[in-house]
Amino acid sequence: MDPVIIGVGGPVGAGKTQLVERLTRAMSHEISMAAITNDIYTIEDAKILARTSVLPEERIIGLETGGCPHTAIREDTSMNEAAIEQLKKRFPDLQVIFVESGGDNLSATFSPELVDFSIYVIDVAQGEKIPRKAGQGMIKSDLFVINKTDLAPHVGADLGVMEEDSRVFRKDKPFAFTNLKTDEGLERVQEWIRTDVLMLDLA
């Protein structure tokens, strides 16, 4: 059975790499996982993941995409597709592969031919009005994550406003608030992977 591919997108610094790191740390004992990171000119995110994650280095592939970061996850996904095939051959038991995009704008989305599900991450420090902008990445993602909730009092962001706006534009689609420094809210993301993605509750 092929692994489920989960795209993780969002602006630079929102916490994409940290989310993948925390999820793999929390769930690697129950789910076989691997990760692919996309950077424009470096493989820095892959190095960070290899250094901080519980995943062995051979389960992490870093790609230098060059140019616009969204191209490698939408218009020309061949590099990511090749990396996915490489990981599948290395680890036939894989259940989940994360594909982290390079930091991009609010309109970036994953090609449905590349990923099965997508997570879009923003951080509170970008301002409470960000969800109201309703970028395509936030609207179309299967899970929307608002990270760095601990910064709300320092930047004058009202989490209640962000929640209300998220409910309006997400409608019935799920979203979660997280503080990945302390793992606050991470269980909500884990539960989404277990039930909505892998449907383990039906197994």
Swiss-Prot record:
Pfam families with a match to the protein in the record: cobW
GO biological process per UniProt: urea catabolic process
Keywords: Chaperone, Cytoplasm, GTP-binding, Nickel insertion, Nucleotide-binding
Main subcellular localisation: cytoplasm
Entry-linked InterPro entries: CobW/HypB/UreG_nucleotide-bd, P-loop_NTPase, UreG
Molecular-function GO term, any one: nickel cation binding
Residues bound to GTP: G10, P11, V12, G13, A14, G15, K16, T17
CDD domains: UreG
GO cellular component terms, semicolon-separated: cytoplasm
Compartments it resides in: Cytoplasm
NCBIfam families for the chain: ureG
Role: Facilitates the functional incorporation of the urease nickel metallocenter. This process requires GTP hydrolysis, probably effectuated by UreG.
HAMAP family: UreG (MF_01389)
Subunit structure: Homodimer. UreD, UreF and UreG form a complex that acts as a GTP-hydrolysis-dependent molecular chaperone, activating the urease apoprotein by helping to assemble the nickel containing metallocenter of UreC. The UreE protein probably delivers the nickel.
Protein family membership: Belongs to the SIMIBI class G3E GTPase family. UreG subfamily.
Name of the protein described by the UniProt record: Urease accessory protein UreG
Source organism per UniProt: Kocuria rhizophila (strain ATCC 9341 / DSM 348 / NBRC 103217 / DC2201)
